[in-house]
């Protein structure tokens, strides 16, 4: 699973008319134009709804009541809902993209009546769920059957929920059993403790959230002025694990980047976005509507609710663009154009698979370079070399970057340094001349 991947998370019930059929050539074509490799469809397995214990009106996608069914409300003809789901997956494949769904090994819905062994209690405030009993010897086999069922529908991988609450060795056995039957299947883990990264990679996961690393640091830089030096420290901590990380600034659990509770607007976060997308070969995830500056202003907590039917304004605007060819409001169009520019750069082979060189250490004393507010790095391969400056400060950055000889030789550069400028909270890119 080498190379940077672009993953797009979406809650289908809030996209278009909320049906599998909405995922057609216009929708997939739009995501293909962004360079998306995998679409993570959240809320596919049938979850509890319409009962007193559920959260919100439709209920939580993470309280699954039947692991071998899809939500009837996603189908035009509920009696054919599995076939409609398979057809959607096939359309994605025809458009050159792969599909992920959630695998939730820690819990099921409170009204679950299937064959997975379940305890009588729940974790935390997940009152609509019951804990899966991983001490029961039947559980691994039951969970393997779930994964086989969905992989047989054409699904290309799984985003695995809250894996730190489940024995890693047992998850590892399941993943190992899936590999021969479904070569190329992807397992992406929601992991929060950096101290657990190695253990879950050893268990066979392909990608891990870098939540307590890149996400927490970038968020704290934006909100509280945390030093950009800590990005270097995280990079050094990750070492050889970097290609297996998933960078993101939004998902369904986190507050919207443009919300008042986070950056406040996209213009305050371009340096962070550029870092998350372009630094090393870690994969990158977008949350639907992020690319047009959706700010969840309809909510009190800065999050797009996964418990309701209400479609965010930014996603509604996207639907008008995708299905009717309507123009986005100017502010949203400007944000989308900026994301397109960065995503286009990220698709270049040098950014997908090339080497990374953190240049902060050799520029700490350079005039104009603020190691707490600036982060500079290079990406290079046999064909290209690029310089990237991320400016987390509130004033324009103008720096004459110095290169150590070992980097210059490794990247095949003629120059010994370059001057580069980046706007406040923004970034700058420069392509080097390489030796012929």
List where the protein language model places each region.
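Structural recognition of the beta-strand scaffold that forms the well-ordered cores
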Residues: 7-9, 38-42, 66, 100-102, ...
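Loop/helix patches that line or flank the sugar-binding groove of alpha-linked glycan CAZymes
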Residues: 49, 251, 256-398, 403, ...
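Substrate-binding/active-site clefts of carbohydrate-active enzymes
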Residues: 1-38, 42-153, 174-182, 186, ...
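A structural motif
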Residues: 36, 152-155, 205, 281
